[in-house]
Amino acid sequence: MVFRAGAVAGSLAIGTAWLAGQSPAPAAATYVGSAACSRCHAPIFDRWKRTRMANVVRDPREHPEAIVADFTQPNPLVTFTKDQIAFVYGSKFKQRYFAKAGDDYTPLPAQWDVTHRQWRAYGLTGSTSGLCDGCHSVNYDVERKTVTEWNVGCERCHGPGSAHAARPTASNIVNPARLDPVAAVDVCVQCHSEGHPHGLVGGREFHWPVGFRAGLRLADFWRLDQHTPGTQETLYFPDGSGRENRMQGNDFVQSLMYARGVTCASCHDPHGTPNNADLIKPARSICLTCHGPKSPNGPHTGTIEQHTHHQAGSAGSECVSCHMPKIAQMLGDVMVRSHTFRFIVPVEAEKLKMPDPCTTCHTDKTPAWATAALTSWPEFSPWRVAR
């Protein structure tokens, strides 16, 4: 088995191997759609079909309830009507609307901010085929502009399933749980990252890894957008943390977690759970599975409170508050969590002019205040104060 030794912002691991008995789906296999999977995997299918990934793209003619924006009040940003909407993308944080343009779709000029229930301008131009559709579908054909199905269906993560549907065996379908950690993470990073294919495809530029399917090596199809350490860029903070949503993969490949074989599925279940972000259990419980008090993985204190210096049960005592701060922009002031798992030291963040986890929560305080507070804590850790 091959494991990666490390990564920096903008790089993917180059080693991929398979666990015993696991290989890519047969080359002759074709895509059959998620409904074919439901015949044998009904409980999993029933959970999946309620997830956001299974419903992020909707046709409002079939699902008029999919449109959550308020069209009852006039707004200068809204220069279109519901009848012009051919496709709806999103529902949790934002919702975007697209009109049919020949055999393609084009964005309409306003998007709905779900959190604040207000319209915001949407300046994206160009067709969705090069920007969006490859990740929001199964088996998108760049020549014909056709799909096996819209949304993240079973075969997006398991590969083409015709052989398995005809004669189910463990060896004729990709199971990400049986892949080595790098290949398993590739399945998610293919879409949860900012990057580009290695070259033009059919003379066109795409923003998703054309040709990749589960079980292949993502690095052969996709190059994460690069970052120059110490500089703030459109996509990256100076320390390499992602500044925008959908950069979880760019973050994660920098992490010690990734280097040690932790995968996305160690924390998330893409088939759906009752927990936020489809976590396998509440976030704190996931972290404490490997990082309980006196754990060899740290923290080495006797209690969690001695490590966090916040009251048990408070927001400040949650592992994600310090190790996964909300610093990546989704829309307006709606932020999502970083996935490098680094503690961003306030004094370093101040030098780099970027957010830190302390003042992200304590919005009325300064990095200098945070540094002084960290210095005064019992169980003092110098690395929390300066690098």
Regions from the PLM with identified roles:
Residues A5-A17:
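Bacterial N-terminal signal peptides
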Residues W18-P24:
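Signal peptide processing junction and immediate N-terminal pro/mature segment
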Residues P24, A28, A35, P43-P109, ...:
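Primarily the internal scaffold of c-type cytochrome electron-transfer domains
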Residues M1-V2:
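N-terminal secretory signal peptides that target proteins for export/translocation
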Residues T106-L131:
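A short, surface-exposed interaction/processing loop segment used at functional sites
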Residues G130-D133, S255:
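Short, contiguous clusters of charged residues that form electrostatic/catalytic patches at enzyme active sites
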Residues C132-S137, V142:
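Conserved catalytic alpha/beta cores of large enzymes that bind or transform nucleotide phosphates
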